[in-house]
Amino acid sequence: MTEAAAPAGELTALGTPLRSFRFGAAGEGNKQEGGARKFVQTAQQAEEYGFDTFFVPDHLGDQIGPIAALGALTQATEKIRLGTSVLANGFRHPVVLAKDLATIDVLSKGRLEVGVGAGWKQDEFLAAGLPYETPGIRLEKLDETLTILDVLLRGQECNFEGKYYQVRGIKGTPRPRQGPRPPICTGGGGPKMLRLAAKHADIISIVPVTTKNGKGLLSGITLEKTIEKVNLIRDAAGDRFADIELNWAITAIVITDDREKTAEMALSAIERGLHPDLEVDVKLSVEDILNSPYVAIGSFEEIAEQIRRVRQLTSMSYVGVFPTQMDAFAPVIPLLRDE
């Protein structure tokens, strides 16, 4: 499982112990990153920079397949943890998936982090001839999958009679190296998904709400909205909340000696629709941009201080970046490594 390290006696604004920071980078092996040939080098570079985890997403477009990619990385890396961010549940049966994931954990000598989500990119499902059910059905299926994975990834025998999946006497083999099982990560931006994550996950990734066209709502990047989501998770998880590691991904990193001017320019670009992955549903201020957990602007020291503040206010401690931002973010890691 993930480590629950915390500086002795220090608490977040939510009253939970401060967790030590962890850092993850995600790579797709797409053309923007140099293609599949450079993928292994990207993971090795992340390891050299001091990232704790290297994640592979799961889509059917211009990128490599996550399971085979992780298999390669088990032999091409030594210490960095390996994860999926996140596997689309509708692409694989949970029993088959459990076998592949357990194998990855064995081959990596216990370095796997299992990220699984409901699947959200409708065009991929339809193009592949896979059923794309309603959000409610996809969440029900994910609930069943996470229940099955919890048993099989412990090396136990699974007997499960669900609405969507039936498993009869399958034992989880090979038994993963990690005990009691590799950590499970899931997450999202909506309340139903976050409650489901609070039920099952060891790691919860908090993201802005995504629209049907795949864009994130601008309102979701604010610190206030993020705190609302953390409070929802805390209420849903109950006593388990202190054992859950909270993750988020910084989507924009700008190294500059003028934070406010850069934030003004970023806000102007967003308002003019120049950020293709965001849907503008609210008017934000420069202060909102500077306080957002998802935007890092400033010197290395200023960004480190911003991340400390995010942890203090939200209990989030597991920081993710994209591979195109690894070089920019790497100098921040030593500033936070032992905190």
Locate predicted features.
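Active-site-adjacent structural elements that line small-molecule/cofactor binding pockets in enzymes
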Residues: 1-339
